[in-house]
Amino acid sequence: MGGNKKESYKKTSLGSKAKGPEKPSCSSARKHQSEPMSKSPIASTSAAAANVTPAKTFAHAVATGSNPGQVTAGVEKLTRKHGVRCLMSSTHGIEAYIKAAAEVVGHSAVVAASKMYGKAIIFARTLTAVHTLVQRGITVGGSYVPVEPLEGLGTRVVLSNVPPFLQDHLLYPHLQALGELKSNMSRIPLGCKESRLRHVLSFKRQVQLLLPRGQDTIEGSFGVPFEGVLYKIFYSTEEVRCFLCKNLGHTRQSCPKGQIKTTAPVPAPSASNKTSYPAGTISAGSSKGISPSLKNLKVAVTQPTSTTSKPPPSSLKTSKAAACLTIAAKEKGGKHVKASPRVTVVPITKKCTPVMGTPEGVGVPMIATSVGVGADSGLSSSDAKKKRKFKSNWLVPEEWASVVNDGAPPSKGKKGSKTSAPHVVTLSGPTVGHDQPVSDHALLPPDQVGNNEVNGLHGLEHGSVGFPTESGVQYLPQNHLEDLPLECKETPNETPAEWAVSVPEVLRFGNCNQPQFLVPQGISLQEGENIGLTPIQDPADKTAGKDGEGGVVDTEEGSQTTSTVHAKISLPLSSTDPNVIAIQKAQEVVERAEANHRASKALPVAGELISSVAPVSNTSKCVSSEVEGTPEPLQGLQKSDSDTFPATTCGEILKALVERGDYQSLSQEELMDEGNIEEEVDIGVANPSTPIIPAEELKKFLESTLGVKLEKKMHMALEKWHDLPLVINSVRQYIKVIKEAKNYGTAEYLRIMKFHKKCLSHQTLMKVKALPKTQ
């Protein structure tokens, strides 16, 4: 038993961690004493080393073999994806960055780190820790330090001026247009030094983008519409930029050019300065009546600055608006002042196709807006700051005179300064009640400016007809009773050919009991353009409407000289800002969806069919223009709730076509009953007894409804529809899609065509809700 206890004791002592060095035995001591003197230094060194506890380092752990696996656990599985990097400052070492990373992901998650080329390279144990570091960043010395991944680095893009309530998914489409997203978007803290305020975020966010080849840096801005307000977001890959000197690396507060030089030399006294006196000291000891404590006081006297000396650099900093006004004044006083553009009068006639032209010059004019201050603006700097309180670049009442008159009124900052005359459209001809130019009735607030209902831009703030502004929206002041003449005039010769746009001849007038005025449809618009005609529903039209409601004057054939039609016209002036063009595409969809009268005015219905639709009348006949190929008026249609034109739904058109006999007999319940239309219809389940619409007639109906020519592939697909036994279900589903798509732009109807093409190829119908709602 005793031997076993000693043996177990030895094993326990050997297996346990020694707290200190073991004492040498007597035999070992005698062995050291018997060694020669030449080895005594080595022996003493080894003995001293034996008495010192070795440092607990990774090398010592590996050399002694004391559990090295615990230190190297997870190192073998590391890849480049586990590494992150960040910039290092000269005041902090690598350990400070390791501690900062450990505070974010935990001390055990940090595996390796090093300083390379002025950057801290840190490897984390898991990819989750890497993503956390990239999204949150680290804080070193009270300053926020962004962290980038090593794998697929891309370029760090910083977004500024981003309100905290804007969600990230609203920014991703704009960022994807710049490059490939390599990381999620993260919010950048404000960097408060107070520990209780470190959670406060700034208006900046960061994201990793893989830019196109050959592009290292990007800088610009884009607009994000949100709840009726357009927010301008700035993005940049460079360092912080000074707005004073436009250089990188510092802000305006620390700009060298903005610092006041306090060590400037004192100028010599001026001969004309009577208050000059020699520099020296004034002693208070010789003065009477002065306290003894002040007798030894000496006041330093310096030469005062002459009145003709230059002010300090800080007083020389003038606003950009003042500088622009000075330049504008010089340009006005010089000989190189551009002449005002000529005004183009655009007529409308019933006998010919009206043509819209533009004033002389193709370039988009620059007009004074609520944010425009400079050579092209009549606003002073103080006025501009007040106008910037508006959420958009709309003209305010004081600025209407700058748009409609020959020049802008004198600005408050500079007497006599005027802006160049903008493009003004004068609607001439016989008038109702007055004969005054449009400018006399143009000084109206923006909320009273009419919309261009032709193009469906119903909700674009205050209006969308006429002039382009910095926001890309074109509008004219409301002309209360100004009328367009019903006589034929040619377009001015100076109008460029590429700017002339022919309006489809669906503008009709009739002497029916109920008012009838068909808005021109199918006008092809380029990106950013806004052109068309819009009827003005004015109470002065006594012959239209009920109880004094607005309408359009009914005109008989041959009465063009006495009666006029109220209408507004817009010029094809396009916006050149790519951001505006991109925003308009999405904004039109949103605004149409929010419009109250979207069901009748936003849908480009079938031009040939709708133009021939007339209200039921037993006492009068509708007078239509002489258009080749126009079908006979359809009977049996009731006037819809819209005041613009009747028969706005495709279902009513199909119903009228069935009653007229163009299609085979289809019951009204099968055609119009939406309750039986399912979200998904399987074409494979067919009813052979269902009547089939001829493919050629269906093709014409689709082409006329959409107002566009179908592709050849689509023609071929439609020709095969007669082989499908369930054509009627497809037509019913198509009607539902059209009804759902009333709020979309013209490009959305091309999506509907692709939608049907996909239905034919896969022999199934997609859900209506799956149709994209943004362009």
Curated annotation (Swiss-Prot):
Keywords, comma-separated and alphabetical: Transposable element
Region (Disordered): 1-46, 256-277, 535-565
Record carries keyword Methyltransferase: no
Organism: Xenopus laevis
Domain of life: Eukaryota
Biased composition (Polar residues): 35-46
Bias (Basic and acidic residues): 1-10, 539-549
Keyword Transmembrane helix in annotation: no
Stated name of the protein: Transposon TX1 uncharacterized 82 kDa protein
